[in-house]
Amino acid sequence: MSDLRPRNRPSRAVRRRRTIVIWSIVGVAVVGAIVAVIALLPAASPAPEPTPSATASRTPTPTPTPTPTPTPTFNTSAQSIDDPASYWVVVNKQRPLAIPGYEPADLVPVPVPFINEPYLRQAASDAVVQMFAAITAETGLELQAQSAYRSYSVQESVYAGWVSSLGQAQADLTSARPGHSEHQTGLAIDVNALPDQGCALEPCWGATPHAAWVAANAYRFGFIVRYPDGKTPITGYEYEPYHLRYVGVELATEMHTTGIQTLEEFFVLPAAPTY
């Protein structure tokens, strides 16, 4: 007879191990499948690395603009225009000398060629010597003094002579009345060519090369042409290219630079066409 007994069934522990093995195989298969799928996906472009921002250029610190030094304004009150002893004294038909009989304390003879021996205040005398030497050195021309300081009494005689010759109205355009003359200050000189060319004390002297040099260069030595052409309504006198007035280099240079020709205009004084 055949053996009909049932076969022995695996134990519970064996079945548990089989289950673990099966699930392990399944897990490995799943993981492998996932890996395979990932491998088939297109590779993602790498994220671009951040470009370092350009270093911000440093804003230059503005250099402060230096405050310009103001140009000094000429001090018109540095000297008196009323004191007869001042180099800036203004004497005209409306402004007589404050002291009628004024006589400068520092009058000296001027060592230059002359027609009438000239006396001037020391500073003016020194300046005349320098100016006469300069025109000769620069051009070969020569100057001589025609007239310089006149006292009150001498001016009386001079003015009377012009009145006798021309009549008072015309004399007043040519010569100052006593007490109103710049010659009394010791700061004025009338110059002429050496040798005389026939225009002494006349407007025609302005056409000479001597007068042209004087007009252009007198300021260098502290002089101005006191009665310029075309300024009779202001100064009260006809054109006198030969009549030089010492005011000092500072004022003469300022007037030359600004182009202001008369003391009346420079110091903003009333015109003085008449007495």
Protein language model regions, located:
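Extracytoplasmic cell-surface/polysaccharide-interacting catalytic and binding patches
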Residues: 2-148, 152-275
